[in-house]
Regions:
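Helix-loop-helix hairpin linking two adjacent transmembrane segments in secondary transporters
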Residues: 108-158, 172-223
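Conserved MFS/SLC helix-loop-helix module at the cytosolic interface between two early adjacent transmembrane helices
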Residues: 29-68
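C-terminal transmembrane helical hairpin of 12-TM major facilitator-type secondary transporters
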Residues: 332-380
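Cytoplasmic helix-loop-helix junction between adjacent transmembrane helices
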Residues: 73-112
């Protein structure tokens, strides 16, 4: 949709990129608190309201007349989607606790890929015939129906949450002193990021995107630091914070502390940010690339790109999940290996996709790129779930969404747009994507050194906590 939106609203490539980042930044910042709400209250309700909000915002985007209006709609879409992935994957983890977990999450990822590609496909057809505004409207309406279906989801093994009134009273009793104490790291890091951004603004020739990136990175580090301090306190039932969260974190004190001190998560978070930069940067600019470089119409882009990307993405998510689970049965690093290898193998294929001039090769290269780039969809989330106690799975997945998107693909669309504006060549700008994807795959593979030990520690902790609970009963 980039090209018709650009013509209608008279936008630059950098502004187009920021439309993507509005969605990603808000999604990133909202994922962690919504993940916590899902763990504390109800994952089903987080999913239901999330689907409703992002569907309504998508529909509203069709009536936007100015850049800031469309920017706001995209931000609301990000807020709606923020709680969906952590809560959904946590519910899947409740149903699939054994060796088929990566495959189950892979099927979930297939649904997301299917919806995304079909949205591009049908959206292109609708935009060609009726305009991009109607494409937004028609893509948003079905989600409102799906929100009603989501309200029927059933969660397993959930303890009833404390009454909302009791929770609010506890939060009020703690007062602003407790809030200030807990979020001080966030304020410090965000302040440093803002100061650096302001310093860069004093120099001519440095684009504002870099200042925004510094502020975003500082904020994400501050949130991670805050969670590092807050969660271990919250799980201690003897503290005031523990009185609020005890219903969700009951008997998982040692496990929750372990989550935030697990080396595997460090490599997964860092590598996840890089591969998210590569994947979503490609998704954001692929249609515009095909229109500008290869001269395809909006409708043909939807068909050409949609068919090949859908086939590759679905096959890659299924094959990656199945392969990871098979390898995991023989070796603890199977899921990590599958996640990282897809990007190491996929980077040269993606580079060839961007450099090829013959359209006869373009379709197969799209298929191969998406096939390899979607191996990680199920396995990477499964690795996180493997080293995280069940009571805080949605919270930790929310933290992963926060960091990977804010430090990853929140930067990709505007940075590619900025490089395209400066070089005058979108192809050259997009070659950054496979390079970052390759680096991210290599970083993920470093977790092969630590994942077996981390899984054993969490498994032994879970057995210890379960045995202790049985003894007390």
């Amino acid at each position: 949709m980039f090209e018709p939106i650009k013509r209608d609203l008279h936008l630059s490539d950098a502004q187009l990129g920021w439309l993507g980042s509005a969605y990603i930044i808000v999604l990133s910042l909202s994922a962690l608190p919504l993940g916590v709400i899902g763990d504390l209250r109800s994952r089903r309700l987080v999913i239901t309201w999330g689907v409703a909000v992002w569907s309504a915002a998508t529909t509203a985007g069709g009536i936007a007349r100015q850049f800031w209006q469309l920017f706001t709609c995209r931000a609301l879409v990000g807020f709606g989607e923020a709680g969906y992935a952590p809560a959904s994957q946590a519910i899947i983890a409740q149903y699939y606790k054994g060796r088929r977990r990566a495959f189950a999450i892979g099927i979930y990822s297939v649904g997301m890929a299917l919806g995304g590609v079909l949205g591009i496909w049908f959206g292109g057809v609708i935009a060609e015939r009726y305009g991009w505004r109607w494409a937004f409207i028609w893509m948003g309406v079905p989600g409102l129906v799906l929100a009603l279906l989501a309200s029927r989801l059933r969660e397993l093994d959930r303890r009833p949450p404390p009454p909302i009134a009791e929770t609010l009273r506890e939060w009020w009793r703690h007062g602003m002193h407790g809030v200030t104490h807990y979020v001080m790291p966030l304020a410090i890091c965000a302040g440093i990021g803002a100061a650096l951004a302001g310093f860069l603004s004093l120099f001519e020739g440095i684009p504002s995107q870099f200042g925004t990136a510094l502020f975003g990175i500082g904020t994400s580090v501050g949130i991670a630091w805050t969670v590092w301090r807050l969660v271990p306190l919250a799980v201690r039932r003897t503290t005031e914070a523990g009185a609020v969260a005890a219903g969700a974190f009951d008997d998982f004190q040692d496990a929750a502390i372990l989550v935030l001190r697990t080396p595997t998560l460090i490599w997964i978070f860092l590598g996840g940010a890089m591969v998210t930069f590569a994947v979503n940067g490609l998704i954001a600019w692929a249609a515009a690339f095909m229109e500008r470089i290869h001269g395809l119409s909006v409708a043909r882009v939807g068909g050409q790109f949609g068919l090949w990307a859908l086939t590759g993405g679905v096959a890659g998510a299924l094959v990656g999940g199945r392969m990871a689970d098979r390898l995991q049965q023989r070796w603890r690093g199977g899921r990590v290996l599958t996640s990282g290898a897809g990007f190491v193998l996929g980077a040269p294929v993606c580079a060839a996709l961007l450099l090829v001039h013959d359209l006869r090769w373009f379709g197969p290269l799209i298929l191969a790129t998406y096939f390899l780039y979607t191996w990680y969809n199920g396995p990477l989330a499964a690795v996180i779930l493997d080293v995280v106690p069940p009571a805080v799975q949605a919270t930790v997945l929310g933290a992963f969404v926060l960091f990977s998107h804010l430090a990853g693909d929140a930067l990709a669309p505007p940075l590619i747009g900025y490089l395209s504006d400066r070089t005058g060549d979108l192809r050259t700008a997009m070659l950054l994507l496979p390079a970052v994807g390759l680096l991210g795959g290599l970083v993920i593979l470093i977790a092969l050194r630590t994942v077996a030990r981390d899984v054993r520690r969490v498994t032994s902790l879970d057995i210890h906590v379960s045995g202790q609970g049985e003894a007390e009963s």
